[in-house]
A protein has these predicted regions:
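Conserved alpha/beta-hydrolase
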Residues: 63-90
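Conserved acidic catalytic loop of the alpha/beta-hydrolase fold
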Residues: 119, 144-165
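N-terminal cap/lid segment of alpha/beta-hydrolase-fold proteins
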Residues: 1-38
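The feature captures the conserved acid-bearing segment of alpha/beta-hydrolase catalytic domains
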Residues: 196-274, 278-280
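Short beta-strand element of the alpha/beta-hydrolase
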Residues: 40-49
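Gly/Ala-rich beta-loop-alpha elbow adjacent to hydrolase catalytic centers
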Residues: 167-176
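Catalytic active-site module of serine/aspartate enzymes centered on a nucleophile-bearing elbow/loop
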Residues: 289, 293-317
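A conserved short beta-strand
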Residues: 184-200
Length: 317
């Protein structure tokens, strides 16, 4: 039973023109629900590239997503549209949005299959309506991609609501790493298939972190050792799904293989410094066929169970 729910904007800035007129923008939009008998720490959900809070809501085939699954497990849930996305589309930059005919590209890159064919055993319902819903949950960025703007808003949210657990996905991964540096209220991070801007100590960037992604950016970044050590202060768990090829014949798929390998290196470096980072490749723990969106795949209950178990082992439930 829901005890309280609501929505609000958080973070952002106010521009003022030469005549004193104002423009409020670059804030995040937050929808939250608190169950009766809520557990100690709420879960804050961050979406990835081309997405908004719909990622965590009803799945494309109509089942309950992580929003309801964890609400039923008595966690307060905060679903966020980051600045310049979805319900937080009031960005402070001038921008022109044109249709990009790229849905088949995302079908591949999100590892549903190789267009128009689905992967054998993929945890995705194979019907036209599900695929239609899947494509319609994509939304543009109203401005440039700016991890500082995004993380400022998430940090403002944690400062507002107090201690919680940050659940991130894809591009939300590096946003999470950035946000951790700006607030003391993140008790742990669980990240699904993070990609981009992986922080390594200056002078210790591994070769695996130097590859250029399909977004034409180097996967790793260098930070001072004092910053790197911040990631040893909270437990972190990272999950990757299935259908990760061993060769680069399909670069849009192999990119995720390289990311999994890199995050294992990152985890070891942090753990060697006293950190608590776990990287889980879902097929290795018996979950097969997962796409880039484990939280909405057909086996999302089992995926959620893994997270619940981890939260319990870290005394976060």
């Amino acid at each position: 039973m829901v005890d309280e729910q609501g929505s609000f904007a958080v973070g952002g800035t106010v521009l003022v023109d030469s005549l004193g007129h104002t423009f409020h923008g670059d804030h995040a939009y937050v929808f939250y629900q608190k169950p009766v008998g809520a557990r100690k720490y709420p879960l804050v959900f961050a979406h990835g590239v081309g997405q908004f809070s719909k990622t965590w809501e009803t799945t494309p085939d109509g089942r309950e997503g992580f929003q309801n699954i964890f609400l039923r497990r008595r966690f307060s849930v905060y679903l966020v549209d980051q600045p310049r996305r979805g319900n937080a589309g009031r960005g402070t930059e001038s921008v022109t949005i044109s249709p990009a005919f790229d849905e088949e590209v995302w079908f591949n890159r999100f590892r549903v299959g190789i267009w128009p064919d689905y992967f054998e055993g993929v945890q995705f319902k194979r019907d036209k309506e599900t695929l239609d819903q899947y494509f319609r949950q994509m939304t543009p960025t109203i401005g440039t991609t700016d991890f500082e703007v995004y993380s400022d808003a998430y940090a403002a949210l944690f400062d507002k609501i107090g201690p919680g657990v940050f659940i991130t996905h894809s591009q939300g991964g590096p946003v999470g790493w950035n946000t951790l540096l700006k607030t003391r209220n993140i008790k742990a991070i669980a990240s699904y298939e993070p990609g981009g801007a992986v922080p390594f100590p200056e002078g210790q960037l591994p070769e695996e972190a130097k590859f250029i992604t399909l977004s034409k950016k180097m996967e790793g970044i260098e930070v001072p050792m004092s910053v790197f050590m911040e990631y040893t202060k909270v437990p972190i768990v990272i999950y990757y799904g299935d259908n990760l090829p061993e060769t680069d014949e399909r670069p849009e798929l192999y990119e995720w293989t390289r990311r999994l390998r890199l995050m294992k290196i990152w985890a070891k470096m942090l753990n060697d410094q006293g950190g608590d980072v776990t990287v889980i490749h879902l097929p290795e723990v018996g979950l097969h066929g997962n796409t880039h969106f484990p939280m909405s795949d057909l086996n999302n209950i089992e995926v959620a169970d893994l997270l619940s178990e981890w939260l319990h082992t870290k005394a976060l439930d």
